[in-house]
């Protein structure tokens, strides 16, 4: 069991998978600092649900200077970060042949650069304390191509490479780094996916119940926990058998 008051930082924790992660970790005794970008009222409701186990912080993945300040503020106001969940992301579809450079750069910078900057801010502190666990949330598009998601898939595949290399860099000093690939999870982020594509994805799943936000959150909580103390540099797929 995790000791009380262990602190986790969850980016994108006000909705979808991130919200489920924040709730699951709080139930397991973690104190959760979670980030939000646009919807302050939504973040406030999550904080109320978590009670003294939750603290909201505003954060935009695209703000290159903000990650360092965020980590510093969390450690000063909440406590030393023992777990980092890089969950926040930006999805926008576009065919490669017509994708503008700015759109490509934005998706790569937000989805891969944001993870890089959060890791860069948190890792030195974890190394100093010789403990910490990082879970980076990727996507099935990293390993299973989907038309219109070349930039998004490239960024999410980059997260897997970052995860493996960083695990090698920091493992000798007690810090673990893993990734999770969620399958098709019915959240607001994928609300605009065409019904025929949703049907095709769901029909490819081996488990009829599909994937839920709480199911993904449980996998992330496991990787953060002491039960996963011997696991690093790995990718855990939570997809109801879609990629099997």
Named regions from a protein language model:
Residues 95-96, 103-108, 190, 201:
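Substrate-binding pocket helix/loop in short-chain dehydrogenase/reductase
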Residues 139:
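Residue(s) in the substrate-gating loop at a strand-loop-helix junction
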Residues 119, 155, 163:
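Active-site helix of classical SDR
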Residues 124, 168-172, 229:
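Alpha-helical segment proximal to the catalytic Tyr-Lys
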Residues 28-44:
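Conserved glycine-rich Rossmann-like NAD(P)H-binding loop of the short-chain dehydrogenase/reductase
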Residues 14-15:
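Conserved glycine-rich cofactor-binding loop
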Residues 116, 210-238, 243:
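C-terminal substrate-recognition "lid" of short-chain dehydrogenase/reductases
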């Amino acid at each position: 069991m995790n000791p009380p008051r262990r602190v986790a930082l969850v980016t994108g924790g006000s909705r979808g998978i991130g919200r489920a992660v924040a709730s699951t970790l709080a139930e397991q005794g973690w104190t959760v600092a979670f980030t939000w970008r646009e919807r302050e009222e939504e973040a406030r409701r999550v904080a109320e649900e978590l009670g003294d186990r939750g603290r909201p912080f505003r954060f935009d993945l695209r703000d290159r200077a903000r990650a360092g300040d965020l980590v510093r503020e969390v450690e000063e106001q909440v406590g030393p970060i023992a777990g980092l969940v890089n969950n926040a992301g930006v999805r926008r579809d576009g065919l490669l042949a017509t994708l503008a450079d700015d759109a490509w750069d934005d998706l790569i910078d937000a989805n891969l650069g944001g993870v890089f900057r959060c890791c860069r801010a948190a890792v030195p502190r974890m190394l100093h304390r010789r403990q910490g666990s990082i879970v980076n949330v990727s996507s099935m598009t990293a390993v299973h191509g989907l038309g219109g998601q070349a930039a998004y898939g490239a960024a999410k595949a980059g997260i897997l490479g970052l995860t493996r290399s960083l695990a090698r860099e920091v493992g000798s000093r007690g810090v673990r780094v893993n990734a999770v690939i969620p399958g098709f999870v019915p959240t607001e982020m994928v609300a605009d996916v065409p019904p025929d594509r949703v049907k095709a994805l769901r029909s490819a799943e081996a488990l009829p119940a599909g994937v839920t936000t709480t199911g993904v959150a449980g996998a992330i909580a496991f990787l953060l926990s002491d039960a996963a103390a011997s696991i690093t540099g790995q990718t855990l797929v939570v997809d109801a058998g879609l990629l099997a």
